């Protein structure tokens, strides 16, 4: 199986599939006719946003690694999240804080995603202290968010709610 095959090695994936069975997990590429298992990331983003909206959150931040074509599921999840806030007329109240593209030069790992949450939350809270919730694209980012908030003496969930997903 291949998890998140990027454009740069699609030819290799295609050659490999000629010799052995290959299943792509997430990031199915339309150019390849291979089996794939995909998560509906747009729906996941909408569900996350709907939960926050149902709890009364209006001013939220969304922290994500780079929204590049290499990891299109990130963009789908983010778009779904924003669409749900847009339906309520609150899209302008969502701050999307995106890591720089240098993060995607290597292979993303637990530490790099944690750092994205931690560092971008520190930046964010210097700029926007009136947020009611901060969302991490995934749980490792959410853990970084939590640690940054604790360090800044915010009480979670009393002062700010935090959400992540993906286990």
Explain the meaning of each model-derived region.
Residues 10-24, 28-167:
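Bacterial carbohydrate/catabolite-sensing allosteric modules
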Residues 1-8:
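Central regulatory/effector-binding core of bacterial HTH transcription factors
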């Amino acid at each position: 199986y291949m998890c998140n095959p990027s454009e740069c090695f699609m030819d290799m994936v295609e050659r490999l599939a000629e010799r052995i069975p290959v299943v792509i997990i997430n990031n199915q590429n339309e150019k390849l006719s291979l089996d794939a298992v995909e998560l509906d990331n747009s729906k996941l983003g909408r569900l996350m946003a709907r939960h926050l909206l149902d709890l009364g959150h209006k001013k939220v931040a969304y922290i994500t690694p780079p929204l590049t074509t290499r990891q299109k599921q990130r963009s789908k999840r983010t778009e779904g999240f924003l669409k749900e806030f847009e339906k309520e007329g609150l899209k302008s109240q969502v701050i999307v804080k995106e890591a720089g593209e240098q993060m995607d030069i290597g292979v993303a790992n637990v530490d790099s995603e944690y750092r994205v949450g931690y560092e971008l939350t520190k930046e964010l809270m210097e700029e926007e202290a009136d947020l009611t919730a901060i969302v991490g694209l995934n749980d490792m980012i959410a853990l970084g968010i939590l640690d940054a908030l604790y360090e800044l003496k915010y009480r979670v969930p009393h002062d700010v709610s935090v959400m992540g997903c993906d286990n």
